[in-house]
UniProtKB/Swiss-Prot annotation:
GO molecular function: metal ion binding; nitrogenase activity
Protein's recorded name: Nitrogenase iron-molybdenum cofactor biosynthesis protein NifN
Residues annotated to bind [7Fe-Mo-9S-C-homocitryl] cluster: C44
PANTHER family: LIGHT-INDEPENDENT PROTOCHLOROPHYLLIDE REDUCTASE SUBUNIT B
Gene: nifN
Keywords associated with the record: Metal-binding, Nitrogen fixation, Plasmid
Disulfide bonds, paired cysteine numbers: none
Organism of this sequence: Sinorhizobium fredii (strain NBRC 101917 / NGR234)
Amino acid sequence: MVHIHRQSKSATVNPLKSSQPLGAALAFLGVDGAIPLFHGSQGCTSFALVLCVRHFKETIPLQTTAMDELATVLGGAAHLEEAILNLKKRANPRLIGICTTALVETRSEDFARQIANIKMTHAEELAGTEVVLANTPDFDGALEEGWARAVAAMIQQITLRRQQAPRSRKATLIERITKPSEQPWKQQKVAILPGWHLTVGDIEQLREMVEGFGLRPVIVPDVSGSLDGTVPDRWMPTAYGGTSIEDIQELGRAVRCIAIGEHMRRPAELLQTLTGVPYVLVQSLTGLKNVDQFVSLLSEISCVPAPAKIHRHRSQLQDALLDGHFHFAGKKIAIATEPDQLYQFATFFTGLGAEIISAVTTTGESEIIEKVPAEKVQIGDLGDLEDLAGGADLLVTHSHGRQAAERLGIPLLRIGFPIFDRLGSQHKLTVLYRGTRDLIFEAANIIQANQPAPSLEQIDAMRKRRNAG
């Protein structure tokens, strides 16, 4: 059983985690025509904006209510109203996603009531724009909680409720024996709730696989449509591409919901409660066994076998496992990231024969931590990782871990958010057959490149010992 060690320091050394509002903003950016709005000071928004721009290398439409000292003391309802109306007038977004910060959450204002009053007072002016509130205080949780809360807020406040009529046994039997191509298209819709740790490339690959089974994936949020680096024909003041508001409204028409990552359990449960759509939680899509189970799930939903292309990708992964497993046996790995991504990579490396000697994460609220294949998990920062990673063969974390890697003399595999000292990080594959294959090659190459070649003297000594034996 893994031992979870809570942080006992009074200060954070080289922070590991990003805040809840940032996670919520990333989720809102996966909706077409959206603008995330930080309800807080300009500094909070500027810091998050810098991280997003450096990671994605794109313009990010992140806005703020610009709370000052007076508004912080007397209340920020006027600032919130002014910001919403200004955004509607200047950008006409389809969605304004409000992310609260610690500055306003500490005052304990009733934001839901304030937004309801704004919507009622300015109903005509705000027509055609959804205003969604996600409570995301900086002092609680981390990036993955913010992402999940934003997705749950969109489902709660946008998705249409649906009272499902009980289906007869005869109707159920007909659905099972009818070919998917003969069933109504709306019955082939599958809602997919990806976790924050899936990259743009991961979501594109995920969509291709689901479509390969004749299903229609509705991905919420879909950052592969908005943060994939495409250049629009004209300047866009909002998120360009992503999930449409109409698709979020019609999530209740899906035959199944697939949530990826433990932190997406609550949004999936909420969707099931509101619409009756049953959900399946997939804790990881990395590794041969996990992907096999996912492919079997898609085959069960669609009633069709896996396409030949998927079998070929699986065969490529098997070959990569044969080629790469020699480089991982007995290797010591140190990982620091959010809980679900920690589980994803820890199980990936231990499946290759490596050992997790140091596991550091941002928050102890997730149940997935108890399943991490390590002796202990430290809730802490990159300073804790540096203290615990002595003797490791590979350090696995985001770009802020590069200084620790240099001081320890350990190679660094960059994952998560932010990655600002490498290009194309958003297109990196980490899931399904091809993503697992690419991770094996990348990690093995990093380990190989940092293993010194034996000198001539060492080779001669080995030959002498062999001949003497």
